[in-house]
Structures are given as structure tokens and as C-alpha cells.
């Protein structure tokens, strides 16, 4: 299976980032505007601090009746996250997601943040490979329907 960096190279190099001092309300606005369900939390030096997901907001803020305007991202972000190394395969990332029940895996190389692989990225990659296989087979197969 492909190396995880190959999958990252197919994604936009733009990261959906937010400051830990931003409000949850700001995070929701950013998620909505960028059409994403997670944000990468970084400090002023662009150092990766954690992830904030729509699930985090729902469970830790909304369902806990906390204020969206006064609660900060740093209070709700997830810092205990499984991470992948740049040398890991896509299959390794799938196993991490399954083991820890997460939809995203941050990828690092020598402590440098490279990006995030999502379960959607992996699914799109699998469908792409599957489509290539079926395209070749479909050209060699004739189908007859009988009623």
C-alpha cells in the first residue's frame, strides 16, 4: 500500500488552522466557511498543538452547555491524538484510526508537522484504485441482459 506522504501530496497544501486562544464560536465559523469538520490548532510559531473537531465541539461545549463565545479552543482541543510518521503506509493510518476510533491522523516527519490524513482521504484513495481496476476489466467484458 502507498506511503502516507503520497496521499498527503494529493491534498491541498493549505491547512485549516486556528489559534488556541480563539473562541469556539470563531472555530465554528471557520469550519463552516472552509467546509471542514476539523481545525489544526497551532501556536504563533505555527507549531502543531492539537486538533479541534466538530465532535469535540458538540460533546465538550454544546452538550456541556458551555458558552460558544467565551470558551477557548485550547480548552476543547484534543492534544492526545495518535500520530503517523511520514514513513507509515496508508494501511498503518487506517489501523490507527480503527484502534483509536478517530477520523484524522496528523502526520509528522522528524517532529515537523506535514499534514492530516482523514478517513475520507483514505476512502477516496481506495475508490480511486478500485475504479482503475474496474475500468480495465470493463473494457474486456461484454454484458448481455436477458428478460
Question: Which residues fall in each region the model found?
Answer:
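Tandem CBS (Cystathionine beta-synthase) repeat/Bateman regulatory domains
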Residues: 1-147
Amino acid at each position: 500500500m502507498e506511503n502516507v506522504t503520497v496521499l498527503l501530496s494529493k491534498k491541498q497544501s493549505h491547512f485549516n488552522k486556528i489559534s488556541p486562544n480563539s473562541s469556539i464560536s470563531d472555530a465554528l465559523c471557520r469550519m463552516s466557511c472552509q467546509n471542514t469538520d476539523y481545525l489544526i490548532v497551532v501556536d504563533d510559531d505555527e507549531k502543531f498543538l492539537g486538533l479541534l473537531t466538530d465532535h469535540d465541539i458538540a460533546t465538550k461545549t454544546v452538550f456541556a452547555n458551555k458558552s460558544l463565545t467565551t470558551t477557548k479552543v485550547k480548552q476543547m482541543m484534543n492534544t492526545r491524538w495518535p500520530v503517523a510518521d511520514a514513513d507509515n503506509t496508508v494501511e498503518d493510518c487506517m489501523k490507527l484510526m480503527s484502534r483509536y476510533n478517530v477520523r484524522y491522523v496528523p502526520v509528522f516527519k522528524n517532529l515537523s508537522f506535514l499534514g492530516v490524513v482523514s478517513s475520507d482521504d483514505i476512502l477516496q484513495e481506495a475508490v480511486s484504485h478500485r475504479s482503475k481496476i474496474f475500468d480495465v476489466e470493463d473494457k474486456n467484458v461484454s454484458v448481455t441482459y436477458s428478460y
